[in-house]
From Swiss-Prot:
One of its GO terms (molecular function) is manganese ion binding. The lineage of its organism: Eukaryota, Viridiplantae, Streptophyta, Embryophyta, Tracheophyta. Hydrolyzes ADP-ribose, IDP-ribose, CDP-glycerol, CDP-choline and CDP-ethanolamine, but not other non-reducing ADP-sugars or CDP-glucose. The keyword Metal-binding applies. It catalyses: CDP-choline + H2O = phosphocholine + CMP + 2 H(+); ADP-D-ribose + H2O = D-ribose 5-phosphate + AMP + 2 H(+); CDP-glycerol + H2O = sn-glycerol 3-phosphate + CMP + 2 H(+). Zn(2+) 1 binds at D25, Q27, D72, H265. Zn(2+) 2 binds at D72, N107, H226, H263. This is Manganese-dependent ADP-ribose/CDP-alcohol diphosphatase. Monomer.
Length: 321
């Protein structure tokens, strides 16, 4: 197996409990290349090639138990009459993987299709229209997938109470007429923009119950969200609206070892004051032709090891005792 020391991969004498594939922000669209609002090039048609290479690599490794897609499966600039076609085109590539893929949606997904439709298309393992869930690939570990747009101005019908409440929240937090603009907001307050969202009260209660159960079972928990939840791991403007509330629940327990996210395309890694690792994954969308950003994570009893390809950085995440 692989290990990382100062960014150098070398053989490890231990076998992992299991491994899983990771990819974030494919944001496919059948449109010419463009740039982000920060001027970073975006390769809309090439991003699906990154996914194809990821799936091919995972299948060749034979030991990848499942994969996780961290959201934004297609881009907001995708022509709306092609949204369904584009989502299906990307999902067809995920279907070529030899194991299951667990999905979450991001803001770009919600620019294209309503929440209920996405829950169905992405085959989220829930018994309702909710987009948060948990699963346990082995007795020692549990994965918790959050819906970072549960409380959001995106994805809900315009006349839905959540939409009205979220817009009221943004009016209070962001004085700009363009609620996607963080101009004038300072520090972590820059997160109060429309392209972000938060975890609602019911989901927070569910999260508490899941972590309580995981603690009783002595499971390590890996928390997954489209939106990052630590200021050290991402741009302030990319953070979840109520990351502080989520982390307050996390800190009541000692079972959460790492939080993974997408959304902030440059990626990042931090360890918070309670020893929890936060790893924001580099985006597939911003890979020039011939380059890639995906990886797999080897899971051990006492650490996680992200083995990245190309633009996705290798990261060793050792747990505190």
């Amino acid at each position: 197996m692989m290990a990382v020391t100062n960014g150098v991969i070398h053989a490890s004498s231990r076998e992992p409990l299991f491994s899983f594939g990771v990819i974030a922000d494919v944001q496919y669209a059948d449109i010419p290349d463009g740039r982000s609002f920060l001027g970073v090039p975006r390769y809309y048609r090439h991003s699906i090639s990154v996914l194809q290479r990821a799936v091919s690599t995972w299948n060749k490794q034979h030991n990848i138990k499942f994969s996780i897609n961290f959201g934004d499966i297609i881009d907001g600039y995708c022509p709306k009459d092609k949204s369904l076609w584009a989502v299906q085109k990307v999902l067809d590539e995920f279907e070529k993987f030899d194991g299951p893929t667990y999905h979450m949606f991001g803001n770009h997904c919600l620019y294209n299709l309503p929440r209920g439709k996405l829950v169905s298309l992405l085959k989220m393992p829930t018994d309702s229209d909710r987009a948060y869930y948990d699963f346990s690939p082995c007795p020692e570990y549990r994965f918790v997938v959050l819906d970072a747009y549960d409380f959001s101005a995106l994805g809900w019908p315009r006349d839905h109470p959540v939409t009205a409440e979220a817009m009221k929240f943004l009016e209070e937090k962001n004085p700009n007429s363009d609620k996607n603009s963080p101009d004038g907001l300072v520090g972590v307050d820059r997160r109060f923009v429309m392209f972000n969202g938060g975890v609602g009260k019911e989901q927070l209660s569910w999260l508490n119950d899941v972590l309580q159960d995981a603690s009783a079972r002595r499971q390590n928990v890996i928390l997954c969200s489209h939106l990052p939840m630590d200021p050290g791991s991402a741009s302030f403007a990319a953070l979840m609206w109520n990351y502080d509330e989520v982390m307050a629940i996390v800190r009541q327990y000692k079972c959460v070892k790492a939080c993974f996210a997408g959304h902030d395309h440059k990626g990042g890694h931090s360890v918070d004051s309670h020893g929890v690792h936060h790893r924001t994954l580099e985006a597939a969308l911003e890979c020039p032709p011939g380059t890639s950003a995906f990886g797999h994570i080897e899971v051990y009893p006492d650490k996680l090891l992200l083995v990245g390809s190309d633009k996705m950085a290798d990261t060793e995440m050792c747990f505190e005792p």
